[in-house]
Regions:
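An acidic/polar, Gly/Ser/Thr-rich interaction patch typically located in mid-to-C-terminal regions
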Residues: 198-206, 211-212
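Residues in well-ordered beta-strands of folded domains
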Residues: 8, 40, 162, 222, ...
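Short, Gly/Ser/Thr-enriched beta-strand-loop segments that form substrate-interacting elements
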Residues: 101-108, 210-230
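Short, flexible micro-motifs
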Residues: 40, 167-169, 229
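Short amphipathic alpha-helical surface micro-motifs
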Residues: 20-24, 203-205, 216-220, 230
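A small/polar active-site loop signature that marks catalytic segments
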Residues: 30, 34-35, 45-199
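A glycine-rich, acidic short-motif signal
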Residues: 1-57
């Protein structure tokens, strides 16, 4: 490619190494093995919970070029489906961030994973960083607090959030509010193809935090675990 490779980010909350590898392979399908110019980051591009465009861009630069992979990326690649190609798209220039570009030719539109998959992953793994990213996308902890209380039909005083992940003793949710939120989610899903088990861990089927042998949870129960040491 004689010129810059422009990445126009759209605030994908779960763009991780696997996504970078897939994007690298998609770029190579266009016959692009080397970019003579820069990797230009435009918009909100997040990767591995890094929100700075240049920092996230450098991670992407590594992800699309297997010749530069760290041991961590190689281990992640080995868990991907058999036959997944190892992309080799080399960037000759630098990673830079710009508000916009004057002239661009679109070649690829990379879609995020479906939100239902992202939420299931977040809850099964109890991924605090991902929860924080989603809360940020919605407007922050206080916006989430207000929307959750309204949806659950409980006073806002029963839901107190200082961050999006719930990590920290300052976050407080009453038992009634926690139960009401589950009921509200199930009610919301009634007009969709999904059920609440598509969003939360299911005991006996999902791993993540449910693998703790000290938990005595009936098989098939839909739950959300939470542990916090002060």
């Amino acid at each position: 490619l004689q010129g810059d490779l422009v990445i126009n980010g759209g605030s994908d909350p779960y763009f991780v190494w696997e996504e970078a590898i897939a994007l690298g392979n998609a770029i190579q399908k266009w016959g692009i093995n080397q970019v003579r110019g820069n990797l230009v980051m435009v918009g909100n591009f997040w990767m591995n919970n890094r929100y700075d465009n240049v920092v996230a861009g450098k991670l992407l630069q590594e992800g699309i070029n297997s010749a530069t992979w760290s041991r961590n990326v190689r281990s992640i690649y080995k868990r991907m489906p058999a036959g997944t190609l190892m992309p080799k798209v080399a960037i000759a220039g630098s990673v830079i961030s710009q508000k916009s570009v004057s002239h661009k030719i679109p070649i690829i539109r990379h879609k995020s994973l479906p939100l239902v998959h992202i939420l299931k992953t977040m809850n099964v793994e109890s991924n605090n960083d991902l929860a924080e990213t989603l809360a940020k996308k919605l407007g922050g902890a206080k916006v989430v607090q207000r929307k959750a209380a309204w949806s659950a039909g409980v006073p806002e005083a029963e839901i107190k959030l200082v961050n999006g992940s719930g990590l920290g003793v300052e976050n407080k949710i009453s038992p009634r509010a926690a139960t009401a939120m589950f009921v509200a989610i199930q009610r919301y899903l009634q007009t969709s193809p999904w059920v609440i088990a598509d969003l939360f861990p299911v005991s006996g089927y999902d791993t993540g935090t449910l693998t703790d042998q000290s938990r005595t949870i009936p098989q098939g129960a839909v739950v959300k675990t939470g542990t916090l040491n002060d």
